[in-house]
Curated annotation (Swiss-Prot):
GO cellular component terms given for this protein: cytoplasm; cytosol; focal adhesion; nucleus
Reaction catalysis annotation: diphosphate + H2O = 2 phosphate + H(+)
Cofactor(s) needed by this chain: Mn(2+)
The species this protein was found in: Homo sapiens (Human)
Outcome after substituting D179A: Partial loss of cAMP PDE activity. Partial loss of cAMP PDE activity
Chain residues that bind Mn(2+) 1: D28, D106
Subunit structure: Homooligomer. Able to homodimerize via its C-terminal domain. Interacts with NME1. Interacts with GSK3; at focal adhesion complexes where paxillin and vinculin are colocalized. Interacts with alpha and beta tubulin.
Region Essential for homodimerization, residue ranges: 393-420
Name of protein: Exopolyphosphatase PRUNE1
Known outcome of mutating P54T: In NMIHBA; uncertain significance
Keywords, ordered alphabetically: Acetylation, Cell junction, Cytoplasm, Disease variant, Hydrolase, Intellectual disability, Manganese, Metal-binding, Neurodegeneration, Nucleus, Phosphoprotein, Primary microcephaly
Length: 453
């Protein structure tokens, strides 16, 4: 694999047609390994004059945000320097020159910025339900399994098992295990095909790491934020909502809030992050397990606009549907309110509707019609000043006894919050894995308590 990837970088220097195997924009471990392994297979089994190049669909600078990928590449001795990232190859220029053929792996819909490349797509290999209206008119291979790496493994072992080396096998093996949550039947992510090909890889390469060991190490690396800057931590697992000119970032942070608040230059970093990305509010939701292996969630609301911050805190504190059970935590930082979240079952997905409601309350208090677009003749600065002037009337307009009506949830990949059969087998985000483990932990504690009685 390593020698092949070295050759791919050399091929970029030549003016010749390329077959680009492109992973999805999330660029998680499954997408990355599937692109690398599929391109490797195609290169080894296709006529010599055709060049197959795997491309990671992110900028190189974003790789440190994906700790599991960085860790795994180091473990199997593949240098990051020989990988090809999206900002290192001009796909649109290649297409215009008639030198691009695309193979999409772990997705089947091009991003809006890449829709012009649709005619270049020759093949799709994915493991999620097809959206026919958006799928390119090409050969499409889709099967609802837990990991796309399973489908790549199947193709290699059925088509050319002799090309599979230990390095590639280790990448595929670890990826399937991480994606399928260590093949845990309680989680329900792994399918019989996932299990079948993990077993086949283990039979071919008996010295592969034990499942528990590779899962634990990859999971630890995925959640590890110790080497990240504050901005990288905030961007690692982030969602954004936007309403009437106000942008709110919601970041999942996998460490104790107290430790996060003690980071040097934190306040300056938060200000810089919000300013750089035009965020009016930053909500940090910390997630970790304590020494008793119990889930802990905490919240921090950072917002320079006093009225807006107050409204958000009011709505979250008095929420009954769902109840967050917030307890104020100490914070010496101005513009930042911190809380311990007593109800650990409220995930970020369930928090999003409450934030939407808080924005509605904010605008309603100023008599701004819901859904009214920003006026072209009023500057953003003028709007911000008017919002701040309305702070007094805002607080008096909120009823402490009024129950917050739940809004339709923002769609997210979560095996816990939605039926896994609704949209096929979903990707498990770090948030979803934490949530599922929390429920299992809570269930086990309840069962143990009842048995004692």
């Amino acid at each position: 694999m390593e020698d092949y990837l070295q050759g791919c970088r050399a091929a970029l220097q030549e003016s010749r047609p390329l077959h680009v195997v492109l992973g999805n924009e999330a660029c998680d471990l499954d997408s990355t390994v599937s692109a690398l392994a599929l391109a490797f297979y195609l290169a080894k089994t296709t006529e010599a004059e055709e060049v197959f190049v795997p491309v990671l669909n992110i900028k190189r600078s974003e790789l440190p945000l994906r700790g599991d990928i960085v860790f795994f590449l180091q473990k199997v001795h593949i240098p990051e320097s020989i990988l090809i990232f999206r900002d290192e190859i001009d796909l649109h220029a290649l297409y215009q020159a008639g030198q691009l053929t695309l193979i999409l792996v772990d997705h089947h819909i091009l991003s809006k910025s890449d829709t012009a490349l649709e005619e270049a797509v020759a093949e799709v290999l994915d493991h999620r339900p097809i959206e026919p209206k958006h799928c390119p008119p090409c050969h499409v291979s889709v099967e609802l399994v837990g990991s796309c790496a399973t489908l790549v493994t199947e193709r290699i072992l059925q088509g050319a098992p002799e090309i599979l080396d230990r390095q590639t096998a280790a990448l595929l093996h670890g990826t399937i295990i991480l994606d399928c949550v260590n093949m845990d039947l309680k989680i329900g992510k792994a399918t019989p095909k996932d299990s079948k090909y993990v077993e086949k890889l283990e039979a071919l390469f008996p010295d592969l790491p034990k499942r528990n060991d590779i899962f634990d190490s990859l999971q630890k690396a995925k959640f590890d934020v110790s080497g990240l800057t504050t901005e990288q931590m905030l961007r690692k697992d982030q969602k954004t909502i936007y309403r009437q000119g106000v942008k709110v970032a919601i970041s999942a942070i996998y460490m104790d809030l107290e430790a996060f608040l003690q980071r040097s230059n934190l306040l300056a970093d938060l200000h810089a992050f919000c300013q750089a990305h035009s965020y009016d509010v930053l909500v940090a939701m910390t997630i970790f397990f304590n020494t008793h292996n119990e889930p802990v969630r905490q919240l921090a609301i950072f917002c320079p606009h006093v009225a807006l911050q107050t409204t958000i805190c009011e709505v979250l504190e008095r929420s009954h549907s769902p109840p967050l059970k917030l307890t104020p935590a100490s914070s010496t930082h101005p513009n930042l309110h911190a809380y311990l979240q007593g109800n650990t079952q409220v995930s970020r997905k369930k928090l999003l509707p409450l934030l939407q409601e808080a924005l509605s309350a904010y605008f309603d208090s100023m008599k701004i019609p819901s859904g009214q677009p920003e006026t072209a003749d009023v500057s953003r600065e003028q709007v911000d000043k008017e919002l701040d002037r309305a702070s007094n009337s805002l607080i008096s307009g909120l009823s402490q006894d009024e129950e917050d009506p739940p809004l339709p949830p923002t769609p997210m990949n979560s095996l816990v919050d939605e039926c896994p059969l609704d949209q096929g087998l979903p990707k498990l985000s770090a948030e979803a894995v934490f949530e599922k483990c929390s429920q299992i932990s809570l269930s086990q504690s309840t069962t143990a308590s009842l048995s004692k009685k």
